Amino acid sequence: MYLGIDVGTSAVKALLIDENSVTLAEADVPLRVSSPKPFWSEQNPTAWWDATLRAIDDLHRQNPSAIAATRAIGLSGQMHGATLLGADDKPLRPAILWNDGRATRECAELDAALPDLGQRAGVATMSGMTAPKLIWLQKHEPDVFAKIKTILLPKDYIRFCLSGDKATEMSDAAGTLWLDEQSRSWNQSAIEACGLTRDQLPHLVEGSDVTGTLRATLADRWDMRNDVIIAGGGGDAATGGIGVGAVSHGDGFISLGTSSQIFVASDKYRPKPEELLHSFAHAIPDHWFQMAVLLNGASCLKWAADLLGEADITALLNRVEAQHDAPSDILFLPYLNGERTPHNNPHARGVFFGLGSDTDRETMVQAVLEGVGFALRDAKSRLHKAGTQCDLPGVIGGGARSRYWIKMIADILGKPLARYEGATKGPAFGAARLARLALTKEPVADVCVKPAIEEVIEPDLTRHDAYRPRFAKFQRIYAALSDEFTPD
């Protein structure tokens, strides 16, 4: 049995699979995000650990014999989160998350100090990355900065709690700006530019490597054997790719999770920072990927549903679909948490345009869904400019539950999309696969097979044409407002 753990933004998810990749038990424990100031986004690392314990306890209750037979654990997690440990190996402050926008000035300073950083790190300097956050801390919380013994990423804090090992792997390290993507090693000049030393970073492994074994006290808690290994794992984008078999050149998918991504696997390192793409090491050796990253995805739908008092999202979507016979009369910029591709603007915010006294909640929700679709089309254009293609991307993540939304996105993109069986398993499933690879050393192709395609959803080209002028207006509205998003 193989256990996958995903430390997400909204929840910790744990999933147990057998030798045939059949899910035997799964559990979700919700998390909360704190925003103590505008553009700040933080979580307490101890909340991740508490949620992880509760999730595995739940698996143990569901299927005690299967959890007892666990042989390996794989880890996945939200990327970029600066998790700082002091001399006692306890967190010094809340972790600063991927969608935190406080370190914009520090990005400019880092670019000035290291003009070639984008080519080596595979991405333009962005405030959500780990490195500029440390420069911000050095300036604004010098007492905390001076006490830093170790910097970990979210899933790697859970690794430390599980096994006592301080390690990370290539796909998650990629999001720090401290990794040299081509050589898959730490970039000493980037580390020093942040006032840090190599000793403050964890050692690097591949996602399919073993980093340690489960602590005896935890093995006893869950009635596990005493030699359960911990695999390197991956950042959530890479583990999502492992989960849907996106490991060969050109394999890809669209993720509709809290954030959204268009992910395409690559056989080489192909940096395109000028297009605001992420060109990162994959979670398996000698593989990379290119990715357009949107900071907002299915979270926009949840935000709208919560705001409108709609507890049953499925029923809400059914009502929206029933009245949807044309593009919405209103537009929505889905930048509730800023945006990366194609704007690199952490200060951008959500906008409804065209509201009238006759606007109903279904029309507003349709606009929200279309806004995410338009943002995906905007981001996809950057992949196209980079020469990156994916013939039939599947859609994964929580948003993939809605066939209606997938069909809408296919219409907006003018591109067929695949619905996978088990598309909502997500990164935890990929983490479990990496656990298996670490234990068995099987060929990647034998383990990371693609899921069965439940349906290929073809675009309605008439509706695609109807969306063209709406998309153009969507772009014009952002361009008109972009300067207004800058804080006073």
Question: Where are each of the predicted segments found?
Answer:
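Extracytoplasmic/secreted proteins and extracellular or luminal domains
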Residues: N63-A66, T197, A386
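N-terminal glycine/serine-rich phosphate-binding loop of ATP-dependent small-molecule kinases
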Residues: M1-P94, Q119, K147, A219-D220, ...
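A conserved helix-loop-beta module that forms one wall/lid of the active-site cleft
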Residues: C194-E206
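Active-site core segments that coordinate phosphate-bearing ligands/cofactors
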Residues: L3-G4, T104, L110-A124, M129, ...
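Short beta-strand-loop/turn "lid" adjacent to the catalytic site in phosphate-handling enzymes
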Residues: N63-W98, V123-G128, R159-D180, H203-E206, ...
